[in-house]
């Protein structure tokens, strides 16, 4: 019976808080239309009071849920403690898996200096656009056009495109 009464009071607090906030907002909008000073005073009293009641109802319902579920959690905790220490499951790494991260770092530290000394050859040259091998002798096959040549080419293409558009319109 006490559980049901608490539930009803909690729901009533939530409902009353919500209704008081709504009523306060209504009085504020009504007071701005009709210039009634009494409704504004009531609105400014109802809004904070409604928020306080609404928040207290929210916290009250949360408190009730926690206290109800606390009994269930205590029961589950007692069951687990009665069984003793829980076994810890571990996974053994078979030999065919790659080494762990820490082990691979140790191998790299040992092998890298020896490789650098042995090779002594710089890496091959690559182009900017792809990973194709580029011959060292033919690094710049042709010089880029000058600024005047590139602008002249743009003007010629713009004029030809404009002429094509005019021809299509006719």
Swiss-Prot record:
Q: Which domain of life is it from?
A: Eukaryota
Primary residence: membrane
Topology relative to the membrane, per the entry?
A: Multi-pass membrane protein
User: According to its UniProt record, where is this protein located?
Assistant: Membrane
Alphabetized UniProt keyword annotations: Membrane, Transmembrane, Transmembrane helix
Q: Which GO terms describe its cellular component?
A: membrane
Residues annotated as region Disordered? 112-147
Q: Where are the transmembrane segments?
A: 8-28, 40-60
Q: What is this protein called?
A: Transmembrane protein 252
User: Which species is the source of this protein?
Assistant: Homo sapiens
Identify the gene encoding this protein: TMEM252
């Amino acid at each position: 019976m006490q559980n049901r009464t608490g539930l009803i009071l909690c729901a009533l607090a939530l409902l009353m808080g919500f209704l008081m906030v709504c009523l306060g907002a209504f009085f504020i909008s009504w007071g701005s239309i009709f210039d009634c000073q009494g409704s504004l005073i009531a609105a400014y009293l109802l809004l904070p009071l409604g928020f306080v009641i609404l928040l207290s109802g929210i916290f009250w319902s949360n408190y009730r849920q926690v206290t109800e579920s606390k009994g269930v959690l205590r029961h589950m905790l007692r069951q687990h403690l009665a069984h003793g220490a829980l076994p810890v499951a571990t996974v053994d790494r078979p030999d065919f898996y790659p080494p762990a991260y820490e082990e691979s770092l140790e191998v790299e530290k040992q092998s890298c200096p020896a490789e650098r000394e042995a090779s002594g050859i710089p890496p091959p040259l690559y182009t900017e656009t792809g990973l194709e091998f580029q011959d060292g002798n033919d690094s710049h096959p042709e010089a880029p056009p000058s600024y005047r040549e590139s602008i002249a080419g743009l003007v010629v293409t713009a004029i030809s495109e404009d002429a094509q558009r005019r021809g299509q319109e006719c």
